[in-house]
């Protein structure tokens, strides 16, 4: 690999780092502000902020890196021979590093508010009570959750998501003539999924969106609870937002290629 190729890959990875991180920065910040200040966003507004983050990030990254912004999509594109294998690991590391770093930035910005909330409600990091605060950064089990149910649901939504995304990205799609329309529609799809499903189940669709913040939480006091979410050591909760989207998006992608693509 020559110098120019390395420089190009480095630039692409940097854009994946920034793009994925920006989604996290906007989305998690809205949750933190709504929870810890007097400025409250409702569920619809928070969903719109997440969708807007996706829209902005795709517009920002697409011309340079292709705007994967998601390890599951990177893996699918590689397995379907649409992406250079030399870029797979750098892209995935960039995406997860981006969410980790921007979670760190959020923590620095809102550290005083987080500490005040912990003091006010006698919250000790690493205890189950502390999951109320940790859930601002990544997803944790809802009351009476079922591991198998949530895992399968994440897969199913991933299948639907990638099929719609691939259909929107077809070369002969009418929207391809208007560069901002496709990112807007994908952002709108994210808004719809958030609106109708996140209050019922923790749908992430993106391993990096959850794993980066989860790793960060494990380093600042939540420890292994950041990964397990409860007492289930055999099936730790982080497997749902980390592994299920990869399975779902790859299944959906191949369904599209084999049965839908013209």
Swiss-Prot record:
UniProt motif (NPA 1) ranges: 70-72
Extracellular side: 37-41, 111-145, 198-201, 220-234
Residues annotated as transmembrane: 8-36, 42-62, 87-110, 146-171, 181-197, 235-259
Record has Cell membrane as a keyword: yes
Reaction equation(s) it catalyzes: glycerol(in) = glycerol(out)
Domain of life of the source: Bacteria
Function: Mediates glycerol diffusion across the cytoplasmic membrane via a pore-type mechanism.
Protein name per Swiss-Prot or TrEMBL: Glycerol uptake facilitator protein
Source organism: Buchnera aphidicola subsp. Schizaphis graminum (strain Sg)
């Amino acid at each position: 690999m020559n110098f120019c190729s390395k420089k190009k890959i480095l630039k692409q990875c940097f854009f994946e780092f920034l793009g994925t991180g920006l989604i996290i920065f906007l989305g998690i910040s809205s949750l933190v502000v709504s929870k810890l200040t007097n400025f409250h966003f409702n569920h619809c507004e928070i969903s719109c902020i997440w969708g807007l983050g996706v829209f902005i990030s795709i517009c920002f990254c697409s011309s340079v890196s292709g705007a994967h912004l998601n390890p599951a999509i990177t893996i699918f594109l590689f397995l379907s021979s649409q992406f250079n294998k030399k870029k797979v690991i750098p892209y995935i590391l960039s995406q997860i590093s981006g969410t980790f770093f921007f979670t760190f930035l959020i923590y620095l910005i809102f550290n005083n508010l987080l500490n005040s909330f912990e003091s006010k409600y006698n919250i000790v990091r690493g205890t189950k009570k502390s999951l109320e605060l940790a859930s601002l950064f990544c997803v944790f089990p809802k009351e009476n959750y079922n591991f198998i149910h949530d895992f399968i649901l994440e897969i199913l939504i991933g299948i639907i998501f990638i099929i719609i995304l691939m259909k929107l990205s077809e070369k002969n799609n009418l929207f391809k003539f208007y560069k901002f329309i496709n990112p807007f529609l994908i952002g709108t799809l994210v808004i719809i999924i958030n609106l109708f499903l996140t209050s019922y189940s923790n749908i992430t669709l993106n391993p990096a969106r959850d794993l980066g913040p989860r790793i960060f939480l494990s380093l600042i006091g939540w420890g292994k609870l950041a990964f397990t979410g409860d007492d289930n050591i055999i099936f730790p909760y982080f497997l749902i937002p980390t592994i299920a989207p990869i399975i779902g998006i790859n299944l959906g992608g191949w369904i599209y290629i084999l049965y839908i693509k013209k």
